[in-house]
Amino acid sequence: MKNEHNKNLDRRDFLKVLGGAAAVTSATLLPGCKNKQESAYTATTDIPTDQMTYRINPSTQDRVSLLGYGCMRWPTVSNNSARDSSDDIDQETVNKLVDVAIAHGVNYFDTSPAYCKGRSERATGIALSRYPRDKYFIATKLSNFAPSTWSREASIAMYHNSFKELQVNYIDYLLLHGVGMGNGLQEFNARYIDNGVLDFLLAERQAGRIRNLGFSYHGDIKVFDYLLSRHDEFKWDFVQIQLNYVDWKHAKEVNERNTNAEYLYGELSKRGIPAIIMEPLLGGRLSNVHDHITAKLKQRKPESSVASWAFRFAGSFPGVLTVLSGMTYMEHLQDNLRTFCPLDPLSDADKEFLEETAQQLLRYPTIPCNDCKYCMPCPYGLDIPGILLHFNK
């Protein structure tokens, strides 16, 4: 249901919000600055170590945990997320998070050369290298966003550096990162086709140094459709898409450039391509909802966290191989383990309930910010996503 106020806050109203929220920013109360989202997570209880839900990759028979660890937000020594902070990554805490995750059956870890300001792969590699190589699947990306990395030589150098940082001699899941961004197909061709990089990656898969090759999709639907139209040629092993109970039917109401997850998932499903799910919480917004929505969710399932509803939605589709969550803090990991150990799939009535919830969320006069931070840094020193997220709350 469209909300015109949602899209068209007038300049005066926005500046009022900006000024008020900027004051809160200085007091370090903003979710974009530091937020453990404590209200979304229940107290720690015993979590079984042998009840993780797994899915089978049809092309490789990999037995993949339905909860995947997104490594974009590793904690820093200042107890912030390394996505936002330049402080040193707290490797000891990263190791502990990985230990708890693996002990409870998580075996899929998703990183990128771009994550944590270029430090995620190294921290992830240090933590995982303490385990036998067959205990985990590592997913990383060819994140050649900058034109300076579009040459064949620069892109291949980035690819080889991932092996070094991750301390591995093969990559389980390699993604073309963020296809559809920027100028759509023109940019995709410059990054992967005109320079011969996709041909190189296909050869690497043939040689066994890449076990599964896919892409993560953002933005221009023409690129998504084009790549699937060439599936017989490229034989995509998986595709990473944004899927949550708002984007399922209302993606364009959140961001006009987005496409409904119902369509994206459906196109993958009819081709038998496994889906990897990103943004199950819509940039954290589905774990930090309006108080009225929180009460509604708690009334239906009092013992469950607000976030668990979104994760159960994403995990309930049979074509989903794993659902990614960027877990900075132990309480986030613990809550997600409760959700997936094992997963309690949604009923049809539950899905209808969440569709009603999505429509209610869209009626609130919010600004469509996913905390991606592509608008940062601000030349005036403002925490733009923090301000917008504070307004939304």
Please name every model-derived segment.
Residues 2-136, 169, 200, 206:
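N-terminal binding-site loop/beta-alpha segment at the start of enzyme catalytic domains
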Residues 49-55, 122-125, 158-159, 221-224, ...:
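Alpha-helical scaffolding within the catalytic cores
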Residues 57, 69, 109, 124, ...:
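Conserved, mostly hydrophobic/aromatic
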Residues 64-68, 108, 135-139, 170-173, ...:
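Structural preference for beta-strand elements that scaffold enzyme active sites
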Residues 87-100, 151-165, 221-228, 307-310:
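Short, acidic/polar
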Residues 131-152, 177-180:
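Structural motif corresponding to the early beta-alpha repeats
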Residues 154-175, 203-207:
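CE4/NodB-like, metal-dependent polysaccharide N-deacetylase domain
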Residues 179-382, 386-389:
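Beta/alpha (TIM)-barrel catalytic core signal, keyed to glycine-rich beta->alpha loops juxtaposed to Asp/Glu
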